[in-house]
Amino acid sequence: MKRARNLLVLLLLAASAAWAVPEVDQPAPALKGVLFSGEPFDLAQMRGKVVLVNFYSSYCKHCAYEIGNLETFYEGHRDQGFEVLVVGVDALADRHRVERMVGLYGLQGVMADDLAESGFERSYPTPTAFVIDRDGVLRSKTRGSKTPQYFTEYVLPLLTK
């Protein structure tokens, strides 16, 4: 009985580590998968760029509001090494809704259920964004819509370093 209990505790600890919440000023967790475009991606391979990972739902009114702001900032700063990755948290049956919205705004995206590897927790309110600096360190975690002021405060300083 004691052995089974110890095994259960070890399994719970391992599971909680796998779904740990990423912490600011710590290395960004792993994130790998295949984009809607069919291209593979690996967040670790994006070192040298500032990356905004945005958890998104096609049913979220705040997500719909902010996606135009994401596109505008991305278009104005991608030449400085800025990338946006939209992670759709909708059910796979709604993949077409997320893919259409992401494509309409010229961003790259993936469905959370299609990820090959993710160290990000799967239960974020949408939208939730993580900004990762050029060294692969998580610099901010923000819930709610991203406004132009958000980009000026949290992303622009990382691009000008």
Regions from the language model: what does each represent?
Residues R47-K49, D79, L107:
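Active-site acidic short loop of glycosyltransferases
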Residues L43-K61:
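Short active-site neighborhood of thiol/selenol oxidoreductases, capturing the structured segment around
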